[in-house]
Swiss-Prot record:
PANTHER family: 50S RIBOSOMAL PROTEIN L3, LARGE RIBOSOMAL SUBUNIT PROTEIN UL3C. GO terms for cellular component: cytosolic large ribosomal subunit. One of its GO terms (biological process) is translation. This is Large ribosomal subunit protein uL3. GO terms for molecular function: rRNA binding; structural constituent of ribosome. One of the primary rRNA binding proteins, it binds directly near the 3'-end of the 23S rRNA, where it nucleates assembly of the 50S subunit. It holds the Pfam family Ribosomal_L3. It comes from Thermotoga maritima (strain ATCC 43589 / DSM 3109 / JCM 10099 / NBRC 100826 / MSB8). PROSITE patterns: RIBOSOMAL_L3. Gene3D superfamilies: 3.30.160.810, Translation factors. Keywords: Ribonucleoprotein, Ribosomal protein, RNA-binding, rRNA-binding. Belongs to the universal ribosomal protein uL3 family. Part of the 50S ribosomal subunit. Forms a cluster with proteins L14 and L19.
Length: 207
């Protein structure tokens, strides 16, 4: 499986044939393999990647990097893999591991929107807009009657909206710029400009 860590730069449009296609530009890598985990030793197979050099690290992390002979990195993320023996600590993974035209899954953290009402958070239609109505943007009934005399857990209500981990699947790689570590994918990816994104080979690619 191919994987890399990056940061979202922003969106633009490119021409593919006669079509204008919306794309997201991602600064992807270079990443360094910090640690590989195996079923025998750790209970599962995974590879730990580091991204962006760190100026300061605490002592436990400094010891972790020293153990594997890798420079301290700012971001550490794990990716599950089937065969961790393909990777070694210190190995560099660049954006050119991906190919133009292949499909990837991109994981990011959505924009945090703070405390939001039910209409914005869940898309509720709200109350009547006409004169005489006493609720316009409220969510309406939230329970039943004497029984069960409570609101069920999981009821869609006002609350904090956004800042959630979301994966968008099957985004096509439109272009790659290895010199500048840029990956261009078709469509949008979660998060604000400068947000961290995890890119891996599509789990169920389009045929």
């Amino acid at each position: 499986m191919k994987m890399i860590i990056g940061r979202k730069i922003g969106m633009t449009r490119v021409f593919v044939g006669n079509d204008s296609v919306p794309v997201t530009v991602i600064k992807a890598g270079p990443c360094v393999v910090v640690q590989k985990k195996t079923v025998e030793k750790d209970g599962y197979n995974a590879v730990q990647l580091g991204f962006e050099k760190a100026k300061k690290v605490n002592k436990p992390l400094a010891g972790h990097f020293k153990k594997f002979g890798v420079e301290p990195m700012k971001i550490l993320r794990e990716f599950r893999v089937e065969n961790p023996d393909e990777y070694e600590p210190g190995q560099v993974i660049k954006v050119d591991v991906f190919e133009k035209g292949e499909y990837v899954d991109v994981t990011g953290w959505t924009k945090g929107r703070g405390f939001a009402g039910a209409m914005k958070r869940w898309g509720f239609s709200g109350g009547p807009k006409s004169h005489g109505s006493k609720f316009h943007r409220e969510l309406g009934s939230v329970g039943q009657h004497t029984e069960p005399a409570k609101i069920w857990k999981g009821k869609k209500m006002p609350g904090r909206y956004g800042n959630e981990r979301v994966t968008v699947r099957n985004l096509q790689v439109v272009d790659i710029d290895p010199e500048n570590d840029l990956l261009v994918v078709k469509g949008g990816v979660p998060g604000a400009r400068g947000g961290l994104v995890l890119i891996r080979s599509a789990k169920a690619p389009k045929k």
